[in-house]
Regions:
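Alpha/beta enzyme core
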Residues: 2-46, 56-207, 214-245, 253-263
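Short, hydrophobic beta-strand segments that form beta-sheet elements in well-ordered domains
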Residues: 51-53
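N-terminal beta-loop-helix "entrance" segment that forms/cooperates
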Residues: 250
């Protein structure tokens, strides 16, 4: 594939994201409307994989979207700090799925993980996952490792395996709310773990880099890591996503050879 073919494919892997304190139902409805009418302006390019918002906007996106192939993703479990009690996290995620969320991105409980209380961190993922799947068995659970807080290879490996063994459908680098966010180094470690886990279990776990990803060059970097480490089977939105707010316009600009500010 040449670079433009990759840019086009990546457009269809983006979780188009708005996670701002100033988000309103009107703003989220406008963003969803742009996705609905994307093919009016760009008929040859794919729609984003999902629209990613705070949990209180799950119902807004679900009501406004016209194509169910564009999923409703929420960040849940008291994102981005994950600092609350498990019942509160479960309640938030459950409400979002009841409101129409197809995917839930939660943050690994670093308050437990960094204290080496791995069972508590694992239990949160298991209980959130099992509860939301009683509402929608097809719901996807992504677990954010916040690799910028871990940094050491061994910690990123431990967090990756813990999340996958607890039932994560995807592991995700970062919330985007702290620095460093996604890095190629962390992505490589996580993809190595996904490959090893798949070899042992046969289960394909997805990978989602997020945070600070905005350029076509970023897209190529993470595409190549996934392609070279995990192979062609992972080059599909079922197993590979990008968390991004600015990258869609930048990819469109690169594809069109002109400045594009559609989203």
């Amino acid at each position: 594939m040449d670079n433009k073919e990759i840019y086009k494919a990546v457009l269809g892997m983006i979780d188009l994201t708005s996670l701002n304190s100033t988000d309103t139902p009107s703003k989220i409805t406008v963003m969803t409307g742009k996705v609905n009418h994307f093919h009016d302006s760009f008929p040859d390019y794919p729609l984003p994989a999902s629209i990613c918002v705070y949990p209180n906007f799950a119902k807004t996106v679900a009501a406004a979207r016209e194509n169910p192939d564009v999923h409703v993703t929420v960040v849940g479990g008291c994102f981005p700090a994950s600092q609350s009690t498990l019942p509160v996290k479960i309640a938030e995620c459950t409400a979002a799925v009841s409101d129409g969320a197809d995917e839930v991105d939660i943050v690994l409980a670093l308050n437990s993980f960094l204290e080496k209380n791995y069972e508590a961190a694992r239990r949160e993922i298991v209980e959130i996952g099992s509860t939301i799947r009683t509402i929608n068995p097809a719901v996807l659970l992504k677990v954010i490792l916040e690799t910028g807080a871990l940094q050491e290879k061994a910690l990123i490996e431990d967090a990756s395996y813990l999340a996958m063994e607890a039932g994560a459908d995807f592991i995700k680098t970062s919330t985007g709310k702290m620095q460093p966010a996604a890095t190629p180094e962390a992505a490589q470690i996580m993809c190595d773990c996904i490959r090893t886990y798949h070899a042992k279990t046969g289960r394909m776990v997805g990978f989602k880099p997020a945070g600070g990803i905005s350029t076509p060059e970023d897209a190529l970097t993470y595409w190549n890591i996934v392609s070279n480490t995990l192979g062609k089977a992972w080059l599909d939105k079922r197993y590979f996503r990008f968390g991004a707010s600015r990258m869609a316009n930048n990819l469109l600009s690169a594809l069109e050879d002109r400045p594009v500010k559609y989203y």
